[in-house]
UniProtKB/Swiss-Prot annotation:
Entry's Gene Ontology BP terms: embryo development ending in birth or egg hatching; negative regulation of signal transduction; negative regulation of vulval development; regulation of DNA-templated transcription; regulation of neurogenesis
Subunit annotation: Component of the DRM complex, at least composed of lin-9, lin-35, lin-37, lin-52, lin-53, lin-54- dpl-1 and efl-1. Interacts with zft-11; the interaction is required to suppress the activation of non-neuronal genes in neurons.
Species per Swiss-Prot/TrEMBL record: Caenorhabditis elegans
UniProt key word Phosphoprotein: no
Record keywords, A-Z: Nucleus, Repressor, Transcription, Transcription regulation
Name of protein: Protein lin-52
Amino acid sequence: MSRPLGFIGYEFGDDEMFVQQMIEKKSNAEQAKMLEQQKKMLECTETMPEESEPVPMKCLDFEEAFQSESVSKGYESPYKNISFLKEDAVTVNTMSHCPADDIAKLIRNIQNSVYTLGIEEARQCRRGKLLNVLKPTGSASPRYLQPTPPKNVAEETTGSQ
């Protein structure tokens, strides 16, 4: 039994069902309107000119331009290309089966080793500098780089009186 729009009956709880039906009708209408808007947005309005060549031929020409050997013959890479040794291939194959956590741990260990070696090298350089080991023996250093002996303060104070 259909009720007129806006009728809310109070007998036997019909008002809740009527309100629910009105909400469903309203949401269905909104969904239909939304679908129409989406269809219009997806509609293609582009037209292809008939006098130009078809798109696939243009794509093939583009691909052929990059596949030609003329580009690679004249190009020289600024990077060194070092071929893999057998040990390198074995290492790569071994590492490909390792989980990511193990690889991250290995990289951290390598970074720690490099850091430790850097600290040790810096310590050795400072030590060599202090001992004047790093200077070439044949050349004399300029006067401003030569160490000056400390002045005797006691002689200066007694000499001025």
